[in-house]
């Protein structure tokens, strides 16, 4: 079990330039809890799961004076809540002639809720109340095969099948992995590998909110972000 709680965080930002002078006060409370359970058998079976709970509540006040004499201000309250569950089962076993087999399955479900509500808005500044409730599911199946030879040569291949959904987006994909190490002499070793790396966007990046850093700079969330996949082939 791990947990953290950081209440009453305060940040003040003052910006002065040719176009505007602004002041932003921001208050944040963050809380995170994680529980992990694992079981390791004596015959190659591993089972586990975890649950993560995260909340972030924030409030912001902005006041800006512009060069043309106009003014803008607002108060905003917002928050983010994440519930994430995951389970997995892995099995490893030895085959004949020195081969090793592995296979398993994993499932992850995450729910990300975030909102922003504006009040006391004055001046020519565009504000919009937002609410987002994302649901993400990832199911993986994998199988691997490997062997180490007495000569020092080793070989391993694996493939992971994934079904990923978030909102109305659904995707099936297969991610291969392979590596070969050929040992001829201590000074002559040949290596070849194929790897697949998948990067998931953070839940913070997928928020639907708009954040004002000052009177003219805005940060927009990107709720339609999707995972990115990289394939790498290396030899030496």
Label each region the model flagged.
Residues 1-236:
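Primarily recognizes Gram-negative and organellar outer-membrane beta-barrels
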